[in-house]
Regions:
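Cytochrome P450 heme-thiolate monooxygenase catalytic core
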Residues: 99-107, 141-309, 325, 475
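Conserved cytochrome P450 K-helix E-x-x-R motif and the immediately C-terminal K′/meander segment
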Residues: 45-58, 62-65, 242-249, 339-381, ...
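Cytochrome P450 substrate-recognition site 1
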Residues: 29-147, 168-169, 173-183, 196-225, ...
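Cytochrome P450 heme-binding "Cys pocket" and the immediately downstream C-terminal segment
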Residues: 320-322, 441-479
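Classical protein tyrosine phosphatase
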Residues: 32-37, 79-89, 96-98, 187-198, ...
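Cytochrome P450 heme-thiolate "Cys pocket" and heme-binding signature region
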Residues: 380, 418-448, 474-475
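Conserved cytochrome P450 K-helix/beta-meander segment immediately N-terminal to the heme-binding cysteine loop
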Residues: 392-420
Length: 493
């Protein structure tokens, strides 16, 4: 018994020493950001609303300040709330905060191997290669503008064939936007009646709805439990696997038909790069990273822009007076005959302001795509341990009431000077900022402007309900804000 007592005492002493050493190490490094007390397993789930995480984080920022800690289940997250801290972290200390954090659902779907979710040297090499190669295949150049103009023409013709029948434009918009990124990464566009592509559009559309389900939100808190439970989150995962297979099959077909001397698209260029690095055991260019990067580019090049355009049509058919003013500007600068082009935008301050306000108002990614610190980091007066998940809240910037008075109201005046000229704002960062800024920002801006002005050049938007009953409030999900379902008639002008 005495030996057992001595052993117990020694064990307690050792544990105490370890706890003291841990406390001393942390105290020397500095205090971590404050936050609500977290409970075992559930973290702060009882103190926040998983149905509306951005709203809960806003309320916590009012109590704990612009830098605070919250626990999503067992996952610790440091939240950055407000323009100053977001800019300071992502730009001024951009390297420290350049890691890609991952919520459980994102990790489940993307596996951390493509350009969006990878880290370290893999991410650096893939991003550098993607930016160079996408430019080589026209992104940001005159060639891609002409492709968008051509696709806008196909979209307009398709809308004319609806003969003013009320419809949900979601599928049409996804198809048009997808064809732009498809022409770059796959080397060709898809016909609007292509059955395999229509199935792909259906999976994407369904997932846009499924991610609003509470089960999808809860997956980010309790992934292990949710993996075993039935529900819409399981269908979301299965649909994603189908989209993954669609892009992987195209990659496999490219392998069979590759002509190294004449690369047709991004996939061919990547396959050539793989061949060049064949003898390099540490090469980041593998068939796995090609498949994941292709999927990343396809989804990123489709999702953000098509959903923004869905929001745009929803918002604008609520405000016919705004549409009328845009159409006057379109008729004056572009006319009814030729296609809109990016060079027109500088002469169309009201239209430019409306597009900026749409992106600001919808706040597409309220918590941003999560970041992580790549090393132990001193930020302001706080210590943030390496690999800590970071939420740089874009909603806190896009809905800042000092920069944008009455931010919850849709108002193009947020981007107009008193004399009607366009007003820039440093707070406009729907594509994020810093080292992880969206690689396709330029392409997305071009698509949104050309597609939207082409639609308004040719059609008046006719609602199927009274204007005052049109709900433009975004539906909040754990990953992105989504528009309500709606129908609208496209009446030729």
């Amino acid at each position: 018994m005495e030996a057992l007592g001595v052993t117990t005492i020694l064990l307690l002493v050792c544990i105490s020493c370890l706890l003291f050493a841990t406390w001393r190490s942390r105290s020397q490094k500095g205090k971590e950001p404050p936050g609500p007390t977290a409970f075992p397993i559930v973290g702060n789930l009882l103190q926040i609303n998983p149905w509306n995480l951005p709203k809960s984080l806003k309320e916590l920022s009012e109590k704990y300040g612009p830098v605070f800690t919250v626990h999503l289940g067992p996952q610790k997250v440091v939240v950055l709330y407000g323009y100053d801290v977001v800019k300071e972290a992502l730009v001024d200390q951009g390297d420290d905060f350049s890691g890609r954090g991952s919520l459980p659902l994102i990790k489940k779907l993307f596996q951390g191997t493509g350009i969006v979710t990878s880290n370290g040297e893999t991410w650096k090499q893939l991003r550098r290669f993607a930016l160079t190669t996408l430019r080589d295949f026209g992104m940001g150049k005159k060639g891609i503008e002409e492709r968008i103009q051509e696709e806008a023409h196909f979209l307009v013709e398709r809308l004319k064939n609806t003969h003013e029948k009320p419809l949900n434009p979601s599928g049409f918009l996804i198809h048009a936007v997808s064809n732009i990124i498809c022409s770059i990464i796959f080397g060709d566009r898809f016909d609007y009646e292509d059955k395999s592509f229509l199935s792909l559009i259906d999976w994407i559309e369904e997932n846009n709805k499924l991610q609003t389900a509470i089960q999808a939100q809860l997956y980010n808190f309790f992934p292990t439990v949710m993996d075993y439970l039935p529900g819409p989150h399981q269908r979301l995962i299965k649909n994603f696997e189908k989209v993954d297979k669609f892009t992987t099959d195209i990659v496999m077909e490219h392998q069979k038909t590759l002509d190294p001397t004449c690369p047709r698209d991004f996939i061919d260029a990547f396959l050539n790069k793989m061949e060049q690095e064949k003898g390099n055991a540490d090469s980041k260019f593998t068939i796995e990273t090609l498949s994941r990067t292709t999927l990343d580019l396809f989804l990123a090049g489709t999702g953000t822009t098509s959903i923004t355009l869905r929001f745009a049509i929803l918002i604008l058919h609520k405000y016919p007076e705004i549409v009328e003013k845009m159409q006057k500007e379109i008729d004056s600068v572009i006319g009814r005959e030729r296609s809109p082009r990016m060079s027109d935008r500088s002469q169309m301050p009201f239209t430019d302001a409306v597009i900026h306000e749409i992106q600001r108002y919808i706040d597409f990614l309220p918590i941003n795509v999560p970041h992580a610190v790549i090393r132990d980091t001193k930020f302001r007066d706080y210590f943030i341990p390496k690999d800590t998940l970071i939420f740089p809240m874009l909603s806190s910037v896009l809905h800042d009431s000092k920069e944008f008075p009455n931010p919850e109201k849709f108002d193009p005046g947020h981007f107009l000077n008193a004399n009607g000229t366009f007003k820039k704002s440093d707070y406009f960062m729907p594509f994020s900022t810093g080292k992880r800024i969206c690689a396709g920002e330029g392409l997305a801006r071009m698509e949104i402007f050309i597609f939207l002005t082409s639609v308004l050049q040719n059609f008046t938007l006719k609602p199927v309900v009274d204007h005052k009953d049109i709900d433009i409030t975004p539906v909040v999900t754990s990953m992105a804000n989504m528009p309500h379902d709606y129908e609208v008639s496209f009446v030729p002008r």
